[in-house]
Amino acid sequence: MNERNIIETQPERTDLPLIVIPVIVESMIEPFAANFPLLHDIARIRMHCDFTLDTDTILERTKDAEAVIVIGFHITDDILDAMTVRGHVSCFAFGGTGVASYINLPVARERGIRVCNVVHYGDHAVAEHAFALIMELARQVGRLDEQVRRG
């Protein structure tokens, strides 16, 4: 990865904590970057603008982080050890739901690691999905869609 694939705010402000987004899907780059000014003078942000599930790459990208925003990858116990016991990470913020599926919460709690969700992440998607389920139950749109597609 070259430097053009990294968006970093206030790199000279080493007095501020570093938040790292080690992986992200392309459609989320602009929405995330648009909110970076909210953290001006609060934290530095380093966002790697690609997606990988390679553990070594994720660990390399987060080696200086104090907080990590987790989107689409699991924090295994080995990764948790590397980032918290041998590293500097004290907080994981998850961009999604089902946090307990992505990290061992009792181990994180035992180590004093904060684990939280990104505020309002997926609010619209949850509401849209709820209405889709209502339409399926009320009008069986899935079955009818299948019939139309079959002719």
Residue ranges and their predicted role:
Residues 1-67:
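N-terminal glycine-/charge-rich "phosphate-binding" loop or analogous flexible N-terminal tail
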